[in-house]
Regions:
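Short alpha-helical donor nucleotide-sugar binding micro-motif in glycosyltransferases
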Residues: 312-313, 320-325
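A short, well-ordered alpha-helix in the C-terminal region of glycosyltransferases
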Residues: 385, 392, 399-414, 420-426
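Acidic donor-binding loop of glycosyltransferase active sites
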Residues: 323-338, 355
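Nucleotide-activated donor-binding/catalytic signature segment of Leloir-type glycosyltransferases, i.e.
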Residues: 295-316
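Short hydrophobic beta-strand element within catalytic cores of glycosyltransferases
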Residues: 347, 352, 356-359, 369
Length: 434
């Protein structure tokens, strides 16, 4: 596994333009690639949206297909403009899906039998993922018909769970090669078909080197097909944080209200800060299943006058909260289900706004946050450590800002969308040469 760090940094040498240059290979006929997702565009998946936009700018003939219907709420204007150019399935497509099964049964009965047998590998101890994979296998029959009709040359799934299951099955039916990206919840834990997908994919992209180490346990062959492709994020942001570091100190947390974010640990740390006499305001931007439990805990800890819940904040508006923040805290944990974050995009965004960061060493986070260099790392599920890190940042503003500036430089070098998405483009071109 010693090669993983080198793979992670292999495309960090030069910056290139996303625009096609006269006489370049971009002028050759573009390969036709299908992207398979659950939803698209999704307001919390700006990293996937940006990848699709930039790959199209590079000249890739890319078509998006979704297993489910439309998510129309909280979309930016740019997302809304692209929303119409998506082929969606969802429950209304069920009659077509059944017809597609009959179509492929007549053409490739042996492959259909193999896909049906694969259902025996689903692990119903994770019913959500297994249910998703069951739907994905059914949807794959209709997707395969569309891929065949549209002359698709490569299939890519943007998640390793149901999306990759659909891509794998459609690849089996059509003979079109497929790849997938492994990120976070989709592989922690992986679904019951992960070995099949790792075996048959021509390329496995991961967001972090930590994910390669995790998936290596399920891969039967060499790791040559693995490629660490860090997400690209817009490097130009509105409003650099002043980091005034004057009371009340502004602490910011952004993310979905789910267990792996560890926001309950941040609230307990906030209680410790209040008990220590620290004057602060804690802002939460996000929504989710744990909204009411978190609000209840806030009340129970007698923090209602210090903690503010903003609800879901669109990507276009979140810059104001970053610009006003003194400290950004992302207290990620490994959930009881083993779900965890890969490398939260909000950490990149906070550093781009020059906000000092406190977070935990979960999964791929240490690939960005080096303790004492680009931010502060603390143990997960340790409110005392979170509180101590916040007090350390408050006590030395200059050192905190210096860490944030080093972190910003690392984001710009490691997560440049032009460089990273060009690397992805080149990977696809190598898979289907023209």
């Amino acid at each position: 596994m010693n090669e993983i760090p080198k793979i992670a940094n292999r495309f960090s040498e030069t910056t290139v333009s996303l625009e096609a240059q006269p006489g370049s290979r971009l002028e050759r006929p573009s390969m036709r690639v299908a992207y398979v997702l659950l939803w698209f565009p999704a307001p919390t998946e700006t990293f996937i949206f940006r990848e699709v936009v930039n790959l199209k700018k590079l000249g890739l003939s890319l078509r998006v297909f979704t297993l489910y219907g439309e998510k129309g709420a909280n979309l930016s204007a740019e997302m809304q403009a692209m929303s119409a150019d998506v082929e969606r399935l969802g429950w209304r497509a069920l009659p077509r899906l059944i017809g597609a099964v009959r179509y492929w049964w007549k053409r490739k009965p042996a492959v259909v039998k193999e896909l049906v047998r694969s259902l025996g590998h689903l692990d119903w101890r994770t019913p959500e993922k297994s249910g998703e994979s069951l739907w994905a296998l059914l949807a794959a029959f209709e997707l395969a018909r569309r891929f065949e009709a549209q002359g698709i040359e490569h299939i890519h799934a943007s998640w390793a769970s149901g999306c990759a299951t659909a891509a794998w099955a459609a690849s089996k039916l059509t003979g079109v090669p497929f790849s997938f990206t492994a990120r976070a919840w989709d592989i922690y834990p992986p679904d019951g078909l992960i070995r099949h997908k790792l075996r048959d994919a021509v390329l496995v992209r991961t967001e972090t080197a930590a994910n390669v180490r995790h998936l290596a346990a399920f891969a039967d062959g060499p790791l040559d097909k693995f490629q660490v492709t860090y997400n690209g994020v817009p490097l130009q942001v509105d409003g650099e944080a002043a980091v005034a570091m004057r009371p009340p100190y502004r602490i910011l947390a952004v993310g979905r209200f789910v267990r792996k974010k560890g926001f309950d640990q941040l609230l307990r740390a906030a209680r410790l800060l209040a008990d220590a006499g620290v004057d602060f305001r804690l802002d939460f931007a996000g929504d989710g299943l744990l909204k009411w439990p978190l609000k209840w805990l806030t009340s129970r800890l007698k923090l209602s006058d210090r903690v503010h819940f903003h609800g879901f904040v669109t990507h276009d508006d979140i810059a104001k909260l970053y610009a006003a923040a003194d400290i950004f805290v992302m207290p990620c944990v490994v959930a009881p289900s083993s779900d965890r974050d890969g490398l939260p995009t909000v950490l990149l965004e906070a550093l781009l706004h020059r906000v000092p960061v406190v977070t935990t060493a979960v999964s791929g986070i240490p690939e960005l946050i080096e303790d004492g260099v680009t931010g502060l790392l603390v143990r997960e599920r340790d409110p005392s450590a979170i509180a101590a890190a916040v007090e350390r940042i408050i006590a030395d503003r200059d050192a905190a800002v210096a860490m944030a500036e080093r972190g910003r430089a690392r984001v710009r070098q490691q997560f440049d969308p032009e460089r990273n998405h060009r690397h992805v483009f080149d990977l696809y071109r190598q898979l289907v040469p023209h």
